[in-house]
Amino acid sequence: MAHAVRALWPHGRALAWRLGDRPALGLHAQSRAGFTGAAGGSGPAATARKGGPRLLGAAALALGGALGLYHTARWHLRAQDLRAERSATQLSLSSRLQLTLYQYKTCPFCSKVRAFLDFHALPYQVVEVNPVRRAEIKFSSYRKVPIVMAQEGESLQQLNDSSVIISALKTYLVSGQPLADIITYYPPMKAVNDQGKEVTEFCNKYWLMLDEKEAQRMYGGKEARTEEMKWRQWADDWLVHLISPNVYRTPAEALASFDYIVKEGNFGTVEGAMAKYMGAAAMYFISKRLKRRHHLRDDVREDLYEAANKWVAAVGKDRPFMGGQKPNLADLAVYGVLRVMEGLEAFDDLMRHTHIQPWYLRVEKAIAEAPQ
């Protein structure tokens, strides 16, 4: 049960997000203690203590980089062939896909994927995974959610990791490449994280596999593309780690959070009752440990407010979204992460004490008005 309830909102083990503390494409989540990164960034002392795992991680990262270069080069060759094969009378790409999303509704990574699918009007079925038994994903050796099963004609593909799912599907929508080919550009690799545990990471996860013309048409320039990637990674590496310490900040907030989780999740009657009270108590104490791990302030609301205002400043006053006149993948990622707090005290405080509400409501409206 403890493992199940800890999977419902993110913490250090909720997803194999990254290898070590890779810098967020130029955007660092710098703490007051001088640590960089989101999940327990590595200071000098930590580096000395964890030299073995970090060396293994560095070696795996180097291998992953070589893999990424190989797959990127292979993509360029394949893209040339695909452009020659593509028909001017190509069927609507979205209508060729049948998608099934395996999720926990209250998971911010799953919420990110839903925001993407809804904004792009991609029809999909939802399977709510029981967080205790997880029988719904027993078919998969990859045991985290979200998982998307994508049927394209006779081809059935499994997509893992929220950012890979989004990047692969967006590449598909823009380029028309077969999804079976696209997913090979995001190869998984095993690595050892700072806690000495083996994790799965994916190469190129924030990169869309587009040719120059497609990239120019979508972004208009390299700066917009880099900005989108940077803030998508920031959402995964920093923003998401502020959720649990804030929604479980006090015993009352922890109980309210688990009341919401039980109502929205796929629990049995007994499991739900146990999760509500035992889970709330467990996560209240775990949230304190997460606060220390991520070097948050005593009042974790301050970190949440700071992150929200930092995002709003990055969007700026001259455009409604980071994507300009419509949300881009960074807008959808940040929105998806924050949305899981709706209905909770932390969300109300966030809307009241930061400048994020106008942007948040614009994204909400853009998703609601997406053509069906």
Swiss-Prot record:
Its EC number is 5.3.99.3. Pathway: Lipid metabolism; prostaglandin biosynthesis. Residues 87-190 form the Glutaredoxin domain. Residues 72-372 are cytoplasmic. Glutathione binds at residues 145, 161-162. GO terms for molecular function: 12-hydroxyheptadecatrienoic acid synthase activity; glutathione binding; heme binding; lyase activity; prostaglandin-E synthase activity. Residues 259-372 form the GST C-terminal domain. The record marks 84-85 as: Cleavage. Keywords: Cytoplasm, Endoplasmic reticulum, Fatty acid biosynthesis, Fatty acid metabolism, Isomerase, Lipid biosynthesis, Lipid metabolism, Membrane, Microsome, Phosphoprotein, Prostaglandin biosynthesis, Prostaglandin metabolism, Transmembrane, Transmembrane helix. GO terms for biological process: prostaglandin biosynthetic process. It is found in: Microsome membrane. It comes from the Eukaryota. GO terms for cellular component: endoplasmic reticulum; membrane; mitochondrion. Detected in heart (at protein level). Widely expressed. Expressed in heart > kidney > muscle > testis > endometrium = ovary > myometrium = spleen = lung. In endometrium, it is mainly expressed in luminal epithelial cells followed by glandular epithelial cells, but expression is also present in stromal cells at a lower level. It is a single-pass membrane protein. SUPFAM superfamilies: GST C-terminal domain-like (SSF47616), Thioredoxin-like (SSF52833). May interact with CEBPB. Interacts with EXOSC10. Homodimer. Isomerase that catalyzes the conversion of PGH2 into the more stable prostaglandin E2 (PGE2) (in vitro). The biological function and the GSH-dependent property of PTGES2 is still under debate. In vivo, PTGES2 could form a complex with GSH and heme and would not participate in PGE2 synthesis but would catalyze the degradation of prostaglandin E2 H2 (PGH2) to 12(S)-hydroxy-5(Z),8(E),10(E)-heptadecatrienoic acid (HHT) and malondialdehyde (MDA). Belongs to the GST superfamily. This is Prostaglandin E synthase 2. It comes from Bos taurus (Bovine).
